[in-house]
Amino acid sequence: MADKSDLNALSGRFRGYYPVVIDVETAGFNAQTDALLEIAAVTLQMNKDGWLLPDETLHFHVDPFEGANLEPEALAFNGIDPTNPLRGAVSEHDALHAIFKAVRKGLKEQGCNRAIIVAHNAHFDHSFVMAAAERASLKRNPFHPFATFDTAALSGLVLGQTVLAKACLTAGIPFDSSQAHSALYDTMQTAKLFCELVNRWKKLGGWPVPAGESE
């Protein structure tokens, strides 16, 4: 069990929150009506010196839920064919159940109280995860119901860029545009970006908070 008073521990860095990077690919913008087609998650860890690093990765292609809307423009944009049997897609329930199980394990190991979604334009990904969890009747959702860490906002502050590819390149993180709009690739790059932003703030002296400012 991690010590919450240890500022080099994950639980001490984010006030007991356990950050998990998420990216989804969908068949539209409406989380209630449009299909979730792909999801990836990257958990994070702190090393002994307090530097944030990617940890475990989970990735699933997802079958559209019954009656889901499939917007042709969205499918053309992300290049996903929901009917392709080679996708190896699973149900929303199975995908989220596996992710939630891994997240709850990480919560316990890191001594955190609750998971929080990290994503680029996080409201979008958060809304699809929450809607899918409700459809799948998954009661033990480890994620905060509304709070998120948004790397688009953080990148705008730190790097002057809000587009994922431009933010990564500005931060010195390679970004292959030909792999963009794959949930797996975007999640991995977003995880690297979030770690870079958090670690850069530490290097600049912003963390731990100077004595007197945290009181």
From Swiss-Prot:
Keywords of the record: Exonuclease, Hydrolase, Magnesium, Metal-binding, Nuclease, tRNA processing
Name of the featured protein: Ribonuclease T
Catalytic residues (UniProt): H181
Top-rank EC class of the record's enzyme: hydrolase
Residues given in the record as Mg(2+) 1 binding sites: D23
Job description of the protein: Trims short 3' overhangs of a variety of RNA species, leaving a one or two nucleotide 3' overhang. Responsible for the end-turnover of tRNA: specifically removes the terminal AMP residue from uncharged tRNA (tRNA-C-C-A). Also appears to be involved in tRNA biosynthesis.
Gene Ontology CC terms: cytosol
Binding of Mg(2+) 2, residues: D23, E25, H181, D186
Enzyme Commission no: 3.1.13.-
Highest taxon above the source species: Bacteria
Gene3D superfamilies per record: Ribonuclease H-like superfamily/Ribonuclease H (3.30.420.10)
Encoding gene, per UniProt annotation: rnt
Site keyed Important for substrate binding and specificity: positions: F29, F77, F124, F146
SMART domains referenced in this protein's UniProt entry, alphabetically: EXOIII (SM00479)
Cofactor annotation remark: Binds two Mg(2+) per subunit. The active form of the enzyme binds two Mg(2+) ions in its active site. The first Mg(2+) forms only one salt bridge with the protein.
Family: Belongs to the RNase T family.
CDD domains from the UniProt entry: RNaseT (cd06134)
Subunit text: Homodimer.
Cross-referenced Pfam families: RNase_T (PF00929)
Cofactor: Mg(2+)
GO function terms (MF aspect): 3'-5' exonuclease activity; magnesium ion binding; nucleic acid binding; RNA exonuclease activity, producing 5'-phosphomonoesters
KW Metal-binding (keyword) present: yes
